[in-house]
Each structure stands twice: as structure tokens, then as C-alpha cells.
């Protein structure tokens, strides 16, 4: 079952601290202003807070340039990392699996049985045992993926819209901290050494680099990424229509292809990477809405929400991030004919 509280994050934690006499809290250090503000608020109370940056691919001192010299274009960053052969450090070994611990707040929390959350159509069916949360399930999923031939075909399948095998599906466990980017890389390296090293396996590393790059962009620019014009790399005006945003959010636009994506997101909390880009482009370019509203909606819906990846990807699409071409404007008809030529995805959700 899933235990949850509806409360301000810090207020909720402090209630637990007081009730159960907790004297220390351990957490991930995230370079985003809301998360940093939460740390500051917690440190102002009688509880020791220990925050660690451990979700990245590299340690801070491995990055081959000062933060203010971080390239504003991903390709320059990637080439610098690869030319200097910067490699992630090996993750700490997992000596023993952590057994599930019964929550100390069961008597006060609401419970949702997984059977009530069954989404058989989802590309990430959380009601299936192998898609459950937690370190053990995440690590088992990681092992299973790299014990298959899926890594060797990843680049060919990664843009598909349906099914559970077209992409790695690591993101929910990565976003929750159950597995780390360094663990993924360690499995990838072993796969390349013992099975096959090809363009597809490189592309898994390529996507890990994107994730790392967006984390560094957040560290470099801080709150600026949330501004209307983002990083200011485009002078395009930012408009907004509340009416159009509601149509998009509820999956009631003039495009059933877009509606299918928005319904999948709302019903399951998951969406393929390709579809995320398509619906984002549609909101910004066809419906003339503020990209930050779309980013906020994704934040409220995604089971794999990651502040850096989410907001940087939205800014990128809108032309207010790190895209040197000033954003991406997808031709929706072409996207549909390429990725859903027979209308199977559209029929599944609409």
C-alpha cells in the first residue's frame, strides 16, 4: 500500500519530527530553489539535516570546467566530457537488500491498494509487481533490463509511443532516488564489455549525459530557469491563454493525437519521451500558451517528475532554454504519420 500525506512538505515533516521524536533527517541535495528553501526551513528547527548530492552521474570535482564556464549548448558539453574521457565513479556496492519497513505513520495516513490503480494500457503499469517502487524493485528491474537484448536496440525503439519495452523505463526509480545514474552506467558498462557495444548502448549513455547536463544548468542558473524568458536565449514573446491551456490539459483540443497523449498522462502519470515533446510543442506553438504552465502541469502529473529534466526540457522546446536553434516546433501531422501511422495510439486513449 501507499502511504501519503496532503500537507506542505516541511510542515508535514516537522509534524512527524515532533510526534516521533526524530532527531535527524537525510535527504538528497537538489539545486532548485524550492528544494533549497525547504532545506533552509528545516535547518531552522531542532532537527539535524544531512543533505547529499548523489543522484548525478559525476561528482562535482569531475566536471572539467568551472560552473560559470558550463557551455549553454549540450553538444559542446558532451564533446568536452567525451574528449577528456570523464568517467562516472563506480557506485558503492549493495551488500544486502533492504527489507521493506512498515511505516510508522500507517494509523494516520490514507492507503491506496495497488489493485485500485490498475492501468493495463499504460507504458508503465504501476499495478504490476515489477513496476512497484522501492530500491529492491528498482534494482531488480535494472538487472532484468541489462540481462535482455533491449539495450542493444534502444536507439531504434526509444521513440515509440506504446508498450513497456521501447525505452529503459528507469526514470521513476531515478527520480525517486531508488537507483542512481551511476548504477545505470555501471550496468551499461558491463553490458558493453560482456555483450555488445553499439550505437544503441551509446545512446543510453547519451541520455544520461543530457540528464546530467540539465542538473548542471540548474546549478548554474538557479531561479532564472523559471522566468518567463528562461535563459534568455530567445527573444520570442511568451503569451498565454487560460482557455487553450484547459483544453490541452483535459485532452479536448482539435487534435485527437494530442488528446491521446494528455489522457495517457492524466490517467497514468506516464508519457513516452517523444509524446512529451509533441504535446509540449503543441501547447507552446499551436495554442500559444506559457511553457511554464505546461511544465507545472507535468510536475503535478508525472510519476517520474524530475525538476531539472522537466523544466529544462520545456524551456528547450519553447526556445527559452539551451536549444541553439531557438526551440522546437513540431509538425503534428508529420509526427502522427511517423509515430502513429495506423492510429493505434490514438485509438487506445481516445
Predicted regions and their residues:
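Trp/Phe/Arg-rich N-terminal binding region typifying the photolyase-homology
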Residues: 1-89, 94, 263-264, 309, ...
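Conserved phosphate-coordination/catalytic loops
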Residues: 4-7, 133-136, 252, 256
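Short secondary-structure transition/capping segments
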Residues: 16-21, 46-53, 96-110, 321-327
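Glycine/tryptophan-enriched, flexible segments
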Residues: 70-228, 336-350
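Active-site-proximal binding-pocket segments
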Residues: 163-350
